[in-house]
UniProtKB/Swiss-Prot annotation:
A Pfam family matched in the record: Toxin_12
SUPFAM superfamilies xrefs: omega toxin-like
Propeptide residues according to the Swiss-Prot or TrEMBL record: 22-29
Organism domain of life: Eukaryota
Keywords: Disulfide bond, Ion channel impairing toxin, Knottin, Potassium channel impairing toxin, Secreted, Signal, Toxin, Voltage-gated potassium channel impairing toxin
Free-text domain note: The presence of a 'disulfide through disulfide knot' structurally defines this protein as a knottin.
Organism phylogeny: Eukaryota, Metazoa, Ecdysozoa, Arthropoda, Chelicerata
UniProt protein name: Kappa-theraphotoxin-Cg3a 2
Signal peptide (UniProt feature, chain positions): 1-21
Tissue: Expressed by the venom gland.
Length: 63
């Protein structure tokens, strides 16, 4: 019973990881949202964000 529970949890975790990877793979051509890695070789930030030169992340523009 204990090993069945462990296998079930591991299987569920693997399923969630694979689903996340598929979702990330589909978003290759999209723009980057909040805290998205930006810079050379990365997708550009969405129009409402700017790429922070200090951190290399998409963030809200400073006033």
């Amino acid at each position: 019973m204990k090993s069945t529970s462990i296998l079930f949890i591991l299987g569920l975790a693997l399923l969630l990881v694979l689903a996340f990877e598929v979702q990330v793979g589909e978003s290759d051509g999209e723009c980057g949202g909040f805290w998205w890695k930006c810079g050379s070789g990365k997708p550009a930030c969405c129009p409402k964000y700017v790429c922070s030169p200090k951190w290399g992340l998409c963030n809200f523009p400073m006033p």
